[in-house]
């Protein structure tokens, strides 16, 4: 396929670890000659801020510091299926997970469903996160005294005079 949507990341919301392990094997990267290709999975959660959870099930949410990536998703899924993962960088242990996802598994980390302030967003970016999920939604608003995640990630758009 040469025009239009040529590839996409199917998204899995916050679910139980057993359901992640059941669903993710079906979302491996795969090319389809006459259709959009599956680029791998985008996983939202379970490391999200409870105050910004939106429709995500709080019963399945985890704190990164007390949860192993491998236990939640399975190592095979981390290596070969998950290509983008959204988490809240301000949670305890999130920076360690960001660095491990990026360096050990090659997963692109997106910050979202987060109550992070500018500094927490900056620490997330320094650890390896390079995307924002739902910019301006499920996060604190952009404010002139507290720019938050959006202000940290996209300063060139907001700070021009």
Labelled PLM ranges:
Residues 1, 28, 96-105:
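Surface-exposed amphipathic alpha-helices with a cationic face
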Residues 1-22, 36-49, 78-90, 107-110, ...:
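Divalent metal-dependent hydrolysis catalytic cores, especially in the metallo-beta-lactamase
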Residues 12, 55-63, 108-112:
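Active-site mouth loops of central-metabolism enzymes
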Residues 20-24, 56, 69-73, 93-100, ...:
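Distinct, well-ordered alpha-helical segments
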Residues 32-33:
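Active-site-adjacent helix-turn-beta-strand microarchitecture at beta-sheet edges
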Residues 49-74:
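Conserved phosphate-binding/catalytic loop of the ribokinase/pfkB sugar-kinase fold
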Residues 65, 89-90, 113-117, 139-148:
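A general structural motif
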Residues 97, 120-161:
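Active-site-adjacent C-terminal substructures of enzyme catalytic domains
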């Amino acid at each position: 396929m040469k025009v239009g949507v040529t590839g996409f990341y199917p998204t899995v919301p916050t679910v139980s670890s057993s359901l992640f392990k059941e669903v993710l094997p079906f979302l491996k990267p795969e090319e389809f000659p006459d259709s959009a290709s599956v680029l791998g999975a985008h996983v939202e959660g379970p490391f999200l801020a409870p105050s910004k959870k939106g429709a995500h099930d709080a019963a399945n949410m985890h704190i990164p510091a007390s949860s192993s990536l491998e236990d939640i998703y399975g190592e095979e899924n981390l290596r070969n299926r998950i290509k983008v993962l959204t988490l809240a960088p301000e949670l305890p242990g999130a920076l360690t997970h960001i660095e491990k996802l990026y360096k050990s598994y090659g997963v692109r980390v997106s910050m979202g469903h987060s109550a992070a302030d500018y500094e927490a967003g900056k620490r997330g970016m320094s650890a390896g996160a390079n995307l924002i999920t739902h910019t301006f939604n499920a996060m604190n608003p952009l404010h002139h005294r507290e720019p938050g995640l959006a202000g940290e990630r996209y300063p060139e758009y907001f700070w021009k005079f």
